[in-house]
């Protein structure tokens, strides 16, 4: 019965692991709801900012902010958002693949690539790959704040202001629903013009800037970039919790199936051992 004992020990080990994955699934489900609330609370602000900036980019302003000017893309920057922890399926690798594919397209055009990374997974992945990382931030936790991101965003904005970058993108996982997380690349700079039909129809008016366009736009456009990066971070956080919940549920279900299989093997081994003992008893009695 040595084999049966080993199987019984393995069943106990799998059951212990199953308890852990079930607990992690429940924790992730709870955190996902909170993350979704935070994401949905900030999404209207980010979307409204995008509409306002889209209108500003289409306007004929007396003051043309540098962020509105198109220039030849010789240096391209990416702010890549990832998680600090694993056990969330292919969430990180999917967004990394999306970013790497886009980077390769720019490299083929002769552009240099520079990164700012959010989350320890992106830091490890791109540093291991030899990428040029200008800024990094990790340890944001389950309640990231805009203040945590200003430093890294500021580094990339300064490089853009000084002509060290000609394009700036943010890469993150967009939360579609619990089952779908979509790797997304959004252009931050130069400011993307709105190409929606609604905006084109309504573009017969313009904003009045008080007191002057320059100081207002200098502040507004920086806030716009910060808000889009922050939205990417909270979207990615909701995706992380959803992906972890799904991964842990799959692990729990797999553990259940494995336990069933092991119990079947155990019962067969036990039955074989009993049959062998009975055969030995019958054989011994016949010999007598």
Curated annotation (Swiss-Prot):
SUPFAM superfamilies per the UniProt record, alphabetical: ATP synthase (F1-ATPase), gamma subunit
Domain of life per record: Bacteria
Matching InterPro entries: ATP_synth_F1_ATPase_gsu (IPR035968), ATP_synth_F1_gsu (IPR000131), ATP_synth_F1_gsu_CS (IPR023632)
GO biological process: proton motive force-driven plasma membrane ATP synthesis
Family: Belongs to the ATPase gamma chain family.
Role of this protein: Produces ATP from ADP in the presence of a proton gradient across the membrane. The gamma chain is believed to be important in regulating ATPase activity and the flow of protons through the CF(0) complex.
Protein name (database record): ATP synthase gamma chain
Organism of this sequence: Vibrio alginolyticus
Gene: atpG
